[in-house]
């Protein structure tokens, strides 16, 4: 399966048969290279990926400044140190799951709930980790 198919079929999927979908998603190498993305995923800057990787290496580096994606600021909320970063911005937010080689991004807006986004992103991330990726 191609990386684009993972984005199209597993991240941009119909969530729990509700007819709702993530706003955008991507699979990005930990080096910042884009492996696959939805058409409307923000253009992420190298320094934004560096800051995300730094947060995974040592939590609480993003909390004071916020998480930036494509210049948009998200308030960092509870995550799982070294594994998941979650951010909130207005009625939407972001979930980022780290695997061995990649970062899985899911961005959502209402009516998608934070827990639904987390489930979609983390399920794919856990699968990729099981596959050694």
Swiss-Prot record:
It is found in: Cytoplasm, Cytoskeleton. Occurs in many kinds of cells as a complex with monomeric actin in a 1:1 ratio. GO terms for cellular component: cell cortex; cytoskeleton. Keywords: Actin-binding, Allergen, Cytoplasm, Cytoskeleton, Disulfide bond. Binds to actin and affects the structure of the cytoskeleton. At high concentrations, profilin prevents the polymerization of actin, whereas it enhances it at low concentrations. CDD domains: PROF (cd00148). Coiled coil: none annotated. Belongs to the profilin family. PANTHER family: PROFILIN, PROFILIN-5. Expressed in pollen (at protein and mRNA level). Disulfide bonds join 95-117. It comes from Kali turgidum. This is Profilin Sal k 4.0201. The keyword Transcription regulation does not apply. The lineage of its organism: Eukaryota, Viridiplantae, Streptophyta, Embryophyta, Tracheophyta. InterPro entries: PFN, PFN_euk, PFN_sf, Profilin_CS. It holds the Pfam family Profilin. GO terms for molecular function: actin monomer binding. The keyword Transmembrane helix does not apply.
């Amino acid at each position: 399966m191609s990386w684009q198919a993972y984005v199209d079929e597993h991240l941009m999927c119909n969530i729990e048969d509700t007819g709702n979908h993530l706003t955008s998603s991507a699979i990005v190498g930990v080096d910042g290279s884009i492996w696959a993305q939805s058409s409307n995923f923000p253009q992420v800057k190298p320094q934004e990926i560096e800051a995300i990787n730094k947060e995974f290496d040592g939590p609480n580096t993003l909390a004071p400044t916020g998480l930036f994606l494509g210049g948009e600021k998200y308030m960092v909320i509870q995550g799982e140190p070294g594994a998941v970063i979650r951010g909130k911005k207005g009625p939407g937010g972001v979930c980022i799951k780290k695997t061995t080689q990649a970062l899985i991004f899911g961005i959502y807006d209402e009516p998608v709930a934070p827990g639904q986004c987390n489930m979609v992103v983390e399920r794919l991330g856990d699968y990729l980790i099981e596959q050694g990726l």
